[in-house]
């Protein structure tokens, strides 16, 4: 008997339905939310991702604000664009699309974003607020993972969650979300220095694979009935594949597909952050 699929697309559509109603209420009150994007260069993946975000905005009624810049811009020009969106009253929240060209300092650019307009929830100030448990925009992918688990009634409180990957966008902030009192999970954060990874994953009620190593998590590493969340993406000769080997589906209780699992929720919670910022005004 195969695992139950954690359907991120269906869950995203539920979120969009809720957001559409909330945006309509904000619009009626003269507070229409706006999502801004800063895209530097012509990377096809980044261009497609930004197009997708603005298509999502159209579905729920959020205003789109695009700033597309050539790859050879100066730091001063990028800073001016960030400052312009910081001051733009029509822009409720925005993101600087990564990666930036190598001559630009990504960390400096992200820190220049007004924390009150941080749609990604990854500004150092907002990550600090997450540590302290004070209200702030939450990182989109970790928030999507928690929502997906709850949507399928997978118990988080008291669960042992093994997170593979310590990146700033997923692994580290996910540990912070899962150890809040509202989630109350016990989290083991694994990385390249972890000894005997399979011994840890076999103990887990929930495994989150977020490293970008094709088919890293195999069936012999998973406890029967465990929930498995596949976040990482790798490009292979066969196309894009996740961190979770297909054989895991035969053993696990629940598995998120990749694509179609967490990715749609990352985009959904980007819009959710913008709507929540507008509602707090």
Swiss-Prot record:
SUPFAM superfamilies: Aminoacid dehydrogenase-like, N-terminal domain, NAD(P)-binding Rossmann-fold domains. NADP(+) binds at residues 165-167, 192, 233. It catalyses: (6R)-5,10-methylene-5,6,7,8-tetrahydrofolate + NADP(+) = (6R)-5,10-methenyltetrahydrofolate + NADPH; (6R)-5,10-methenyltetrahydrofolate + H2O = (6R)-10-formyltetrahydrofolate + H(+). One of its GO terms (molecular function) is methylenetetrahydrofolate dehydrogenase (NADP+) activity. Keywords: Amino-acid biosynthesis, Histidine biosynthesis, Hydrolase, Methionine biosynthesis, Multifunctional enzyme, NADP, One-carbon metabolism, Oxidoreductase, Purine biosynthesis. InterPro entries: Aminoacid_DH-like_N_sf, NAD(P)-bd_dom_sf, THF_DH/CycHdrlase, THF_DH/CycHdrlase_cat_dom, THF_DH/CycHdrlase_NAD-bd_dom. It holds the Pfam family THF_DHG_CYH_C. GO terms for cellular component: cytosol; extracellular region; plasma membrane. CDD domains: NAD_bind_m-THF_DH_Cyclohyd (cd01080). GO terms for biological process: L-histidine biosynthetic process; methionine biosynthetic process; purine nucleotide biosynthetic process; tetrahydrofolate interconversion. It comes from the Bacteria. Pathway: One-carbon metabolism; tetrahydrofolate interconversion. Its EC number is 1.5.1.5, 3.5.4.9. Homodimer. Belongs to the tetrahydrofolate dehydrogenase/cyclohydrolase family. Catalyzes the oxidation of 5,10-methylenetetrahydrofolate to 5,10-methenyltetrahydrofolate and then the hydrolysis of 5,10-methenyltetrahydrofolate to 10-formyltetrahydrofolate. This is Bifunctional protein FolD. It comes from Mycobacterium tuberculosis (strain ATCC 25618 / H37Rv).
